Amino acid sequence: MTRGEPLKIVPARFDDAPAMLAMQRLAFEPEARASRSSEIPPLQETVEGIREHIRTATVLKAMDGDRLLGSVRGILAGGTCLIRVLVVAPDAQGRGLGAALLAAIEDAHPRIERFELTTNMAMVGNVRFYLRHGYEMVEQLQHSAAIRLAFMRKIARR
């Protein structure tokens, strides 16, 4: 990270969408390899799809100066916040950015009863990450022939 300038987690803007898409394609490539499938939803997304989430959901980005290091989305559905596409740039992983983004999206929704997400079972480290942060495995879902998802939930502590 840049010396003297702290990491900032702030709302994403429409003009962030191309950089967000480029970063998520790099970051989700290992998942595609592990699954032996390019059917990973973040790899199928478009700039327009990201812009739609920026318009309709809570989309946060992690910035180090002018550099985008990560992002996360929170989509409200009743008393639930669906966490989608938590992503950290490959060269910035392992430094706590994912945990900071997860905490920020949870903090952005103080009245929510629960948080839910899915993550690829092939990415064991990701499943462990969410378990460490208070999420419980609810069930496993078959997304496609090659992709099995962990459906996880965390009850909000308020």
What are these regions (language model features)?
Residues H109-N120:
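Conserved GNAT acetyl-CoA-binding A-motif
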Residues E48-K61:
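A short helix-loop-beta-strand connector motif used in the catalytic cores of GNAT acetyltransferases and
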Residues K61, R67-I75, L82-V87:
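Conserved beta-strand in the GNAT
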Residues P110, L131-Q140:
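Conserved acetyl-CoA-binding loop of GNAT-fold acetyltransferases
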Residues K8-A22:
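A short beta-loop-alpha structural element at the N-terminal edge
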Residues L21-I50:
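Conserved GNAT-fold acetyl-CoA-binding loop/helix
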Residues V88, G94-D107, R128, R132:
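Conserved acetyl-CoA-binding loop-helix of GNAT-fold acetyltransferases
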Residues K61, L86-Q93, T119-M121:
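A short, internal acetyl-CoA/4′-phosphopantetheine-binding micro-motif in the GNAT/acyltransferase core
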